[in-house]
Curated annotation (Swiss-Prot):
One of its GO terms (molecular function) is phosphatidylglycerol-prolipoprotein diacylglyceryl transferase activity. Belongs to the Lgt family. InterPro entries: Lgt (IPR001640). It comes from Prochlorococcus marinus (strain MIT 9303). It is found in: Cell inner membrane. A 1,2-diacyl-sn-glycero-3-phospho-(1'-sn-glycerol) binds at residue 154. Pathway: Protein modification; lipoprotein biosynthesis (diacylglyceryl transfer). Catalyzes the transfer of the diacylglyceryl group from phosphatidylglycerol to the sulfhydryl group of the N-terminal cysteine of a prolipoprotein, the first step in the formation of mature lipoproteins. This is Phosphatidylglycerol--prolipoprotein diacylglyceryl transferase.
Amino acid sequence: MDAFIATFTSPGPELFQLGPFALRWYGLLIAIAVLIGLNLSSSLARKRGLEQGLISDLLPILVLTAVVGARIYYVAFEWRNYSGDNFWSSINIFGLAIPIPSAMEIWGGGIAIHGALLSGTLAVLIFCRWRRQAFWDVLDVLVPSIALGQAIGRWGNFFNNEAFGVPIKGDLAWKLFIPFVNRPLNYANNEFFHPTFLYESIWNLLVFTLLIVLFQRSNKGLLKLPAGALSCIYLITYSLGRVWIEALRTDPLCLGALPPSCEGGLRIAQLMSLAMMAVGGFGLWWLYGRKRKLPDPGRPKSFA
């Protein structure tokens, strides 16, 4: 009997095509995640007593900034694939080929969540200073939606046949089939790989569940959760999972080396995750060890 009980095979990146326009699964999943996140974070914001309509005002800015930041971050570390002869590409609109920089072809894949987190956090900070809102309170109602959005968005990697793990060795109860054209050259003869998209999706669902449980207990007065604590917990828990999952991937962003092994170099996502864990750990120590509030960059006077 076949030892495998679950085989994942992508139907392809496109849901359907209408003329020159195609609806991609990745885009649809991101849209779904944004809508769910809007409703969830708006509900949490009401429970936190934040200004009505704050999240709906912030969301368009946050999404745009996060997507642009995710793309810039990815292109910066993969510049060899977007420079020189690869700099220009084209987009076909009603039979007319329009030249564009290849770095703008975000629909072809190539975004990095750490870039989205960095640029998104900056957007929240600027927004809070503009609206004179408490930065940590706003961030705390966003992080559960971010974790859930990551869980949903990871399935976009499945449809795109990207961000998969190393070939499966031995018997496992699951496997991911990758078409020949999407396999790294050194794994061209391997058909089945670790479904790292699934690992991270499940991990992010667990992080989301933890954050919601903590938020609800805090809201009921059963747990002391100072402003910023939930954000710090997200940084630690998400990064814990990302560190070990990243070690399995065949397409990591590398520093001083090339994928899939990054031999002789470093995996950027692991470095960023370790840094996020350190920041989150320091934040919790500040809140619970020193029993002090986190300085609020959204309200400059709080530094006085």
